[in-house]
Amino acid sequence: MIITTNRYVVRAEYAAQNQEHIRQVMQDLRALGRTDLTYSVFVEEDGKTFVHWRICANGEARKVFDQLPSFQAFQAALTASRPEVPPISAPRLTLVGSTSDLFS
């Protein structure tokens, strides 16, 4: 299992566009219907600090995610927006427990 988390702060004027890019990624991921990856994105109270959680069952799921055109477009747009704080990745996480089965 591959678990990654990223946190960054966008400029206030880019926050709505960032959310739209995220919605597109989510729509495309749902359309794939894959059961071997889960992706959640949160925004903090300031409306411009984003936290992404990605859990992939294996390297293949991660590769599919990374190669998704909408995800690549999201990343390019985020970089071009010159965020106040660029994405910072936490060290790779190890699952200790969950209230539900992640990949059944």
Where on the chain are the PLM-derived regions?
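A generic structural signal for ordered secondary structure
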Residues: 3, 23-29, 50, 84-85
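Short amphipathic alpha-helices in soluble, non-transmembrane regions
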Residues: 20-23, 65-71
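Residue-level signal for secondary-structure boundary sites
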Residues: 14-16, 60-62, 98
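Short amphipathic alpha-helical segments
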Residues: 14-37, 78
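Glycine-rich beta-strand-turn "strand-cap" elements at beta-sheet edges
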Residues: 37-51, 73-104
